[in-house]
Amino acid sequence: VAVTLSSLQWVAALALINNIAASAGISWARHTPWLIVTALLIFVTPLGRLVVGGYAARLLTKGIAPGSYPRAGRIYLRVWAAERIANASGYRSIADATWVNYYARALGARVGDGVNLHTIPPVTGLLNLEDHCSVEPEVDLSGYWVDARHIHIGTIHVGKNARIGARSVLMPGTVIGDNAHVEAGSTVTGSTPVKANARWSGSPAQKVGRSKHRFPDTPPPRRPQWVLGYGLSSLFLALLPLCAVAMGGASMIAFVQAIDIHPFLGMLAAAPAGTLIAFAAYGVCIWALIRLLSLRLTPGVAPVRSATGWRVWFIQRLMDDARTYLFPLYAAQLTPLWFRSLGATVGKDVEISTSVMVPAFVTIRDGSFLADDTLVGGYELGGGWMLAGATKIGKRSFVGNSGIAGPQRKLAKNSLVAVLSSTPKKSKAGSNWWGSPPERMRRVTVTTDASESSTYRPRLRMRILRGAIETLRLLAPITSGVLATAVLATLQVLLLNLGLGVTILLGGVVLIAAGALALLITVTMKWLCVGRHRAGDHPLWSWFVWLNELQDTFVEVVAAPWFFNHTLGTGWIPQYRVTPSWRENRQRRVD
């Protein structure tokens, strides 16, 4: 059902393409009444899918109460189905925007006045957000967790004016008191309530002091016009990739019309070029928008509902989307140039992976390394206010996977922030940090056989070889583009021969077949590039690292959207990992 819901956007786009092509006199097009096409388009827009996904999930989870239930039981299945329906509805496109408050209410959550909810609410609806509380991006509010035999479900309560830092986890049963503050990257277990005015940090979180007054005590003016501004902006963000795809598709149709070839064969032949055109168009749009929004952007505290607050939010959303749709551009030699062109100050020999930041506020010195999923700069929320500030990463410093360097942080040279850790406000040169709140970690010197030419200062020959391998990453979006063309071609055959109704019913089957093919291609690339992974150390400038990044691009760009997104929480993902026993795999779930 969830896959069929996802396929509706494909059918709607196909019907629109057919109507436009039919009006232009193209022979292979079939006209569908505009009333039906309009209804389909409204249904598959972010807002339309939001209503369907929200109320469908609420219907599935109606009557579920806090408690522990068998993993193989009905409650688990209902929650899993609600998650899949919500995912298919495209709820992520409205995260951090005005619409997410309405989506939370549609799920059954209680959302007070002046709440700034910049993350996804739980499908269970067991969430209570009191007036003027703030929840920053990527906070886990799912309200349940799964072990070997049970699913544990609980409520989450966030008090008035409370602040929940980015990438924190609130476990079932969490109670956050009024004016309390949970720092970024923390995990609140729910075993002990967070009292009013307290500041908690860590994983598991514990009290570290009193809540700091980083924002004005009184909320800013309501400014209702910005509610509409945020809402329209989220719709624009959802439509921007489609506009880029439309440019690529138009070039493909023009190619087919210019030569004497069967339309379907011509579209498949033109798919690689059309994909690259769409990829480039989206990149140019992202670059132009970020540069425009960064003009005269100043750090400091500003109302969320203001030009400054909106611009900071918009830029971070664009950067977050870019690392998904422009994934081949990241963790590459071109990545520092990309961030530099967006307005960040980036030194020489810098390595940047899938990092999210407000470029105008970030300085990265020579030889530094930002690993996967790092959050550099960003913003903090509190009582309707937003704080954005400059962040500096010192020379030859390292921020580990999913590390956080918040606004107004400075990491000294030759320093390290460990995986899933936060950066201190100030640090001494040569210091190591881990955890949240960050604590000093003893530095251990490791001797390796790798030379500077394979770590920090590669020779020209190595740069050329790496560039050649990284260029091959474009094969991943091209493969995804060919799959998309094949899906549309198959749906077109169904539309011409069996009609719109049958096409809608079989759309999910077509997507499942495409997902299976995407998985097969990705697995093949994995074995061709790196074979079986074995424990060991490899210098950054080595064939193994380059080829591993190449196969990972296929995982993220081909397998993830076509297969993994539709099979979360099932036994298919562990099976993809080619573990030795199918009997063992049947007991595993990856979400």
Describe these PLM feature segments.
Residues 1-108, 196-342, 428-577:
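Terminal amphipathic alpha-helical/low-complexity segments used for targeting or macromolecular assembly
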Residues 104-106, 110-202, 206-207, 339-340, ...:
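Structural signal for interior beta-strand "rungs" in well-ordered beta-sheet cores
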